[in-house]
Amino acid sequence: MDLAVELKEGILLVDKPQGRTSFSLIRALTKLIGVKKIGHAGTLDPFATGVMVMLIGRKFTRLSDILLFEDKEYEAIAHLGTTTDSYDCDGKVVGRSKKIPSLEEVLSAAEYFQGEIQQLPPMFSAKKVQGKKLYEYARKGLSIERHHSTVQVHLQITKYEYPLLHFVVSCSKGTYIRSIAHELGTMLGCGAYLEQLRRLRSGRFSIDECIDGNLLDHPDFDISPYLRDAHGNSL
């Protein structure tokens, strides 16, 4: 293997900017370093920010299945009083409520999100049912039967000033934070959607270790000093 290519293999930790798709960062990295074998340990929705673990080269893309199963941690803001079809800020508003839950009601509802819970995936998600992604049905205005998944969550309310509810949650693979916001709104009787989302940690990798994702657009940017091995050590 050419030494220049070998040095471009490893794990790159990126802070995904708001408004960009996860795959736009993968394309930017591919163009920057000329290595086509690039994977990840979990995508983020366009409106979300935070840790993206990018896997460069065959040796590291093989780690994808392992890293995808590791726990993740997020900080989020739910917007109470409004419901959207996608459960997030990019969706169509489908309901409004004038009810203003008390702090006591909020804290009581949050107690449900401790430990093992059953969660229903959003219709606007990449979860596959009958060979198609749920969002493919949703975009056609179709609703299809979904099945609950068992996930592990630990949620902590950090701030509440209606209509914004701030919380931090650590969770297992396959947890939809959008669904947590939606479920909180349902339990409170006012509805809610996910206003903001930031991934703070993916497995052992934290936001403090990430580079700004926009740097990948700079043709002269050198990723070599930021590459890590599977244990998180610098290469």
Curated annotation (Swiss-Prot):
The keyword 4Fe-4S does not apply. Its EC number is 5.4.99.25. Responsible for synthesis of pseudouridine from uracil-55 in the psi GC loop of transfer RNAs. Pfam families: TruB_C_2 (PF16198), TruB_N (PF01509). This is tRNA pseudouridine synthase B. Keywords: Isomerase, tRNA processing. GO terms for biological process: mRNA pseudouridine synthesis; tRNA pseudouridine synthesis. It catalyses: uridine(55) in tRNA = pseudouridine(55) in tRNA. Belongs to the pseudouridine synthase TruB family. Type 1 subfamily. The active site is at D45. It comes from the Bacteria. One of its GO terms (molecular function) is tRNA pseudouridine(55) synthase activity. The keyword Zinc-finger does not apply. NCBIfam families: TruB (TIGR00431).
